[in-house]
Amino acid sequence: NNTLLDFGCGAAGFLLKAKKIARKVVGVEVEKRLQSHFKQVGLQVFQDLSELRTHMKDEKYDVITLFSVLEHLADPRTVLGELSPFLKDDGQIIIEVPNANDALLTLFKCEPYSQFTYWSCHLFLFTAETLRDLAVQAGFSVNYVKQIQRYTLSNHLYWLAKGKPRGHEIWSFLGSEVLHEAYEKQLAAIGHCDTLVASLSK
């Protein structure tokens, strides 16, 4: 029965899944070329928060999500603050970002991976600490910041051996759920997973 706002929804893959279980889903996406796609699949997606406010008035949401979005924003603190009025008093914001303390960057110091990462379109890289600080500066309480490892050990080994991506596909023979869970648990314990997921509230 929850309502959801996905900020920076891209092609709306998550919204389409959420639509099956949420009472109402709404998106914000700046890419104009996707508007025809949103209409085709029956989604309400606005180009910015101003347009959302105009059409949805004072509507507030149980959950606001930002998946792989915050690191692309020129002023993430301001944007988080602007999202606050759209969040219900007992709602939460879920943020997913790459971890600046990714093991390949800071533990293994893989130069090809560093070049691959730092030449991307990310304007910011967050650690668990800087993500917490940003949330507090934007006026939120932090419920948690979790370490999540998206890429497998085979991906990391391939980067270290070959200096290239897609190791999880090319060396898929090393793929094992048990192995991945153990690797993720160990990286999380020392703060070096590749992804951070945070929950914020008012």
PLM features per residue range, with description:
Residues 1-110, 120-137, 195-202:
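Conserved SAM-binding loop
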Residues 114, 121-123, 146:
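Flexible, active-site-adjacent loop/turn segments at secondary-structure boundaries
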Residues 25, 142-143:
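Hydrophobic anchor at the start of a short beta-strand
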Residues 100, 137-141, 160-163:
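Phosphate/oxyanion-binding loops and surfaces in catalytic or ligand/nucleic-acid-binding neighborhoods
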Residues 109-118, 159-167:
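Short glycine/proline- and charge-enriched loop/turn segments
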Residues 146-202:
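A C-terminal cap/extension of S-adenosyl-L-methionine-dependent methyltransferases
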Residues 35-36, 115, 188-189:
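Short secondary-structure boundary/capping segments
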Residues 44-46, 143-146:
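General small-molecule cofactor/ligand-binding pocket signal
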